[in-house]
Curated annotation (Swiss-Prot):
One of the Pfam families matching this protein, by short name: PSII
UniProt xrefs under HAMAP family: PSII_PsbB_CP47
Coiled-coil segments: none
Main location: plastid
Protein name as annotated: Photosystem II CP47 reaction center protein
Transmembrane segments: 21-36, 101-115, 140-156, 203-218, 237-252, 457-472
Molecular function GO labels: chlorophyll binding; electron transporter, transferring electrons within the cyclic electron transport pathway of photosynthesis activity
GO cellular component terms attached to this protein's record: chloroplast thylakoid membrane; photosystem II
Location(s), subcellular: Plastid, Chloroplast thylakoid membrane
Amino acid sequence: MGLPWYRVHTVVLNDPGRLLAVHIMHTALVAGWAGSMALYELAVFDPSDPVLDPMWRQGMFVIPFMTRLGITNSWGGWSITGGTVTNPGIWSYEGVAGSHILFSGLCFLAAIWHWVYWDLAIFSDERTGKPSLDLPKIFGIHLFLSGLACFGFGAFHVTGLYGPGIWVSDPYGLTGEVQPVNPAWGVEGFDPFVPGGIASHHIAAGTLGILAGLFHLSVRPPQRLYKGLRMGNIETVLSSSIAAVFFAAFVVAGTMWYGSATTPIELFGPTRYQWDQGYFQQEIYRRVGAGLAKNQSLSEAWSKIPEKLAFYDYIGNNPAKGGLFRAGSMDSGDGIAVGWLGHPIFRDKEGRELFVRRMPTFFETFPVVLVDGDGIVRADVPFRRAESKYSVEQVGVTIEFYGGELNGVSYSDPATVKKYARRAQLGEIFELDRATLKSDGVFRSSPRGWFTFGHASFALLFFFGHIWHGARTLFRDVFAGIDPDLDTQVEFGAFQKLGDPTTRRQAV
């Protein structure tokens, strides 16, 4: 059977045993990849600095997903929060990786068994003796089992009743830890940033799935609906399954890109909107203002800002700054962050405090402009010196650092002031090590960006696949060329055009 590459899956179209085999093999490949990728990431991951070199800066992709489900310790003796552990137990990062690889191997063997022993009695129709599947019944079984798993995850794992809970943090990603979560049954449960909604929605959706599964197991579909939706055709299953997958892919692409309780910034990095809206900058200024209100000096107030919070307020951690084909981690772009230099405050010779206008997300270069508290431009780094009116030299801009490594240090040298003004465009100023990884200085995206791009792309492809296979199963008779109302028996090969007696082939 000379099938083109895009039609090879027809070999399992009417072969339930081998259809099952290839799906088990697919599960083996998925689980095997997950386990292998986890081991690779653990081999290259450096857990020594969870504040300035967290998992998302290092380009970890599967470690954040394990962590948000409650895994925090390694058999290597380290914890994701920076401490050391003596008894991590079986469910460490390595334990999860190993269990996936073990499961993959078992699925591999099961796939081979089902490929060899394909002609099982369970796949045979008692009335006709031909291979067939009771698809509505199978749908009910799968719905019931997935509902059970969904309910169990929400009621036991997330709540901590039998399980660790999930990763929960504050709005600024500073105090995250794994903890049990109580279900949120009120209107607050619909807030995507409330962790309690994860528990309540899994419990509710799981209950619905269990009830719907029992319904489909006990009630047969009406004949008209069965025929109308082509429920006897395996391609209907393919089409509707693809629909479920692409819908889920669109949803998770959204929750990842825009942020939610399921995608904590400590594990996946901040969102681009937090940079666009000055989210962390506002919180930093609020904290400094609160410190000043308590009669602290500027230096004391800025010194109390957590380095972790300051690091979020840096454009290099914005996932939208990475280019489409810039492979690699954030660390291999602008370098490994070593320390916060402190917050620079610029002043002109009249003593006015000046603020550097920050670079918008989608700019690679941006003019250095310093404005006062009223938004009036007071200084800049001009493109043409001959025409300049507001140059650092003319205005007499000075800089002083508060907090961080340069706390209390001031500069009046124009070249130094301009250097730090350029860096202040990018948010808080950090010392970055570009030598260790030979970082090229070009921004990279975080796993948040990769996940979103991958899932949005595949969702679009799968949407097309749903339309394609849905059309094929609904209009199969039209595409085959056979009149559905044809009463006479059709002999394949007897006519040039299938089912058309006027095009009977001539005997040679």
